[in-house]
Amino acid sequence: MNFNAITPDLFIGTTPAVNDYPRLRDLGVRLVINMRWERRPAPDPHRDPISFLWLPTVDSPLFPIPLRKLTNGARTAMEIIRSGGKVYAHCAEGRHRGVAMGACILVAQGYDPFEAMALIKDRRAIADPFAFYIRPRIVKFARQWEAQSLPS
């Protein structure tokens, strides 16, 4: 498992194996968000298991990440973070889909979408939040999130 701490409560990286769960637990991770279509998360065998959210997506410009999945992930992550837990977002390489999810979590925490993308790129060299098919999903999520957060 290769990962980076983006903020004190958000990590982005590669797919964790079952033997990585103790390390995640030691870091305070209470939620793992799996963005991989091709690989379902392995259950945590610990008596107090880490929660998993499987949001299968495809890493392809032909299949944009659905906003409903980004919203679901951000909402679930915010519940965990507000309760004092930490979140680990991943895809296969921690480059696109997991990065998009991480950026959306940061937006939900109040970051400007471009600041969120820059922070992730700064903390995880392989991350590519500015990819031509990833950036627009993050920006669109930010607009939608802000519109839903405005008082009516």
Go through each PLM region and give its residues.
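C-terminal domain-closing interface element
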Residues: 143-152
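Cysteine-based protein phosphatase catalytic domain of the PTP/DSP
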Residues: 2-86, 107-139
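Short, amphipathic alpha-helical segments that act as regulatory/interfacial helices
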Residues: 103-106, 142
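A phosphate-binding catalytic loop at a beta-strand-loop-alpha-helix junction
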Residues: 84-103
